[in-house]
Amino acid sequence: MRYFTADLHLQHPLLADLRGFPTPVAHDAAVMAELYLLDPDRDELWILGDICTGGTESMRSALAQLATLRVPMHLVAGNHDPIHSCNRKPERHLAEYLAVFRSVQQHAVADLGGATVQLSHFPYLGTEDRFSRDRFTEFQLPDHGDWLLHGHTHAAERRSGERSVCVSLEAWDLRPASEIEVLREMR
């Protein structure tokens, strides 16, 4: 079964607090506990960006935690991931990411229930972020009629548009969304 999530932000003091945890360690333990429930023989995890808070130290801490998972993982990078092209010299981190993830990309395409689904960290172009501002517009995909799974917004609502599903942890009770759950949202 494929699972989708975004915006883990491991070791992030502010996000830990906003999500109701006393410390980043407690936050990370709760997030990782949900990921440990995935079966490495049957499941696959797609993380749609922002595993960390940004910066090399944060990146290495997040990668070390994620490396303890045995489930196959793919990353669609987000703006807080040093591997994303919005950051300086992202290529210098590629080997470290590929030691943990089977693939690392800025955007991907999947087939879910016969539908073509775009996978991106960012919502469709024209969708404002949670602060009602246009940011990272050069990385937002235009809506050409496909469904989109994304993160970035940290929205509690799962549906973010006519053909968009947000897989940020906030929308899924701090756990990854299964392909079956995503397909339900797409109905």
Language-model regions, residue ranges each:
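Core catalytic region of metal-dependent phosphoesterases/phosphodiesterases
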Residues: Y3-T5, L10-D111
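Conserved beta-sheet core of the metallophosphoesterase superfamily
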Residues: R92-R187
